[in-house]
Amino acid sequence: QRILLSLAKSAKDLGCELFVLDDGWFGNRNNDKAGLGDYTVNKKKLPAGLEGLADRVRSMGMEFGLWFEPESVNTDSDLYRLHPDWALTDKHSPVLGRNQLLLDLTRPEVRDYIVENISAIIDRAGISYVKWDMNRHSIALGAKAHDYILGLYDVLRRIFDPRPNV
């Protein structure tokens, strides 16, 4: 957190208006093989939580943005251990790429989970910008591709329509 605040001060001194915290702020996300999908703040990394960091950044006169990759999950994550059935599969097995799986956005419960969790974080920490990452091609989607994209549009609408300034 100390390093992030030092970077934020440097960003402010350079005239930046927005400070965006990238990947690694949550769960057991210490490498690209673990924690993706577990969007609870890692208090060892951010003792004051996202709210505390965001407040400090705003006190410097900048807005605060945050990274998410809500469509993906690592097999080494609490979310996957709790809901392995939420991962997209190719016939019978999940399709692993870049150490991650895609969540099945054709399923209403998956979309609800993403919307509820991301919305709560945005609202609690006063996030003004979301960096929505996605580093997978859609080959694993197959026949579900159209319904997956409709599910993604539903998630985006439900998160951002009530928050037009994000």
Language-model features: locations:
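Conserved structural scaffold segments of CAZyme catalytic domains across common CAZy folds
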Residues: Q1-G65, E71-Y80, G97, L102
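Active-site neighborhood of glycoside hydrolase catalytic domains
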Residues: N42-M60, R81-V166
